[in-house]
Amino acid sequence: MPFYVYIVLAVVVIIFAWVFIYENFIKDDSPTSKIYPSRKPENTAFLKKVLNHGAIGEPLIMYDQNISKKKLNADPYRLELPVFSVSCQERGLVVGVSGSGKTNFILAQILDWMKSGKSFVCSDVKPEIWGILASNGMLDAFGYQYIVINPTDPKSHKYNLFDDLKSDNDLDELLQVLLPAKSADSAVFADLGRLVLKASILFVRGNNEGQVSLTSVYDFIVSQSSSKKLLAKLKDDGSEKVKELVSLAMKTSESDKLFASAINSVVETFQFMSNDTIRHNLSCSDYSLDESLKSQKVAVFLQFEQDSMNTTERLFSLHVQHIIRLLMSNARQRDDVFLIFDELLNGGKIENLADRFNLIRSYKMPTFLYIQSVAGLVEKYGKAEADKIISACSLQICYRVNDSETAEFFSKLCGQVTAERVNKSVSPTVTADGRLINKTNISKNLEMVDLVPPEMMLQLGFGKALCIYKGQSAIINIPQHFKDTPLTGGADFVRLGDLDEITETAEVA
């Protein structure tokens, strides 16, 4: 036989041998059940339909992935390139564990926002956001004036909240944050404390040519040797309004012990005043936030640092509440101001935060809250209030999380989609001619499955996040400043005090 016939026979033998080995030793005939969802969670087509595209001066949600490399190389900061955003009437909630990339998104949002020249307020608790922007010349490049409020930095811009108060209602709201009722049992102490504190504020203002600060009020209160002498001073030398407040406090309770406890609660609230730097920074103002935020191209950074939060958490909440109140009162006199509150849960509880968020929709204050978990929000505000805060945020973004409660929460928000389940099994069957063969049985049926299963939320990769808006959900490529823009440098300094030290070192050199 010709040689090629041997080759053909050899190939045939090898094929039959492989089929025999595969069928008898390799092939897995165990039953299988696979699910094929009608839609993948990475499909952003539906989400894109409800997001705005090409608007300037709206909160960034994601970049347009269809922009060509040529256009990106010509415009790396995307100054003229369209992005996906949401209306300035919206509020957003961003959830993700530490290190998941939330700060990268904040920086990307700020860079995109600065294209519009509109002002913004950003909490910077690490701190690093102001430092990265300033070190890389971004604030100067976009022509922004910055105000850095850091109560524990001696070189920080000083700010006295009372300088921007316009009414009794403004003062009362701040006192609610400064002296909240922590429980039903402590409500009477808080009420009395607020009356005495308000009387003291008005007393100091009336005796200091209209000037008053937390520092001067604290100094006045501790200068009185006892609660009796404080009340006597207010009642004897105060204005009619001060006397009215003292009388109201005395009618509320005639117990000297109760008064002493209430005043002690006021003094305890001012424990942060034992820090001389904080006392100095709260005593006067370098800027009026009310006037500054009416202007374009102003960036305010609230640097209430994480390692000092045990001391300054009440001050942090006080400034957040104060800024929201200011922006509500001057809304008709300004453009949109973007509020970015990172690690809001590190501060003290802000009373009626959910109601406030529902109100600000029409006040030109797009607001994004950044937190580490839904569980933390519930722990801080309670289940009912936490649910209201989440509901007040029309857009939710969730990075990888570590707790199953948050993962299940966002999975449920995404809803379910139809899926085809294909079941496959193999069973031995005898043919008509008596041969034993394996018969494959396939069945198909439809069922509902989670669009984004909880386990996916626990395993999201870096740079990925779930976005939920107007009933649509998708896993998106979340904007990252260091990857998507030329802003790749770190921070050479993080506080105004660091900047002064660098300048002094350079001058010596």
Residue ranges and their predicted role:
Residues 1-10:
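Feature marks short, highly hydrophobic, charge-poor N-terminal signal-anchor/signal peptide-like helices
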Residues 9-15, 99:
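Membrane-embedded transmembrane-helix bundle of lipid-linked glycan/lipid transferases
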Residues 18, 22-40, 71-78, 83-365, ...:
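P-loop NTPase motor domains
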Residues 35-51:
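Membrane-cytosol interface motif
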Residues 48-81:
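N-terminal pre-Walker A segment at the start of P-loop NTPase domains
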Residues 57-60, 196, 418, 437, ...:
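Polar low-complexity intrinsically disordered regions enriched in Ser/Thr and small residues
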Residues 60-63, 102, 199, 421:
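Residues at secondary-structure transition points
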Residues 357-359, 363-466:
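Conserved ATP-driven motor cores of ASCE-family P-loop NTPases powering translocation/secretion/packaging/pilus
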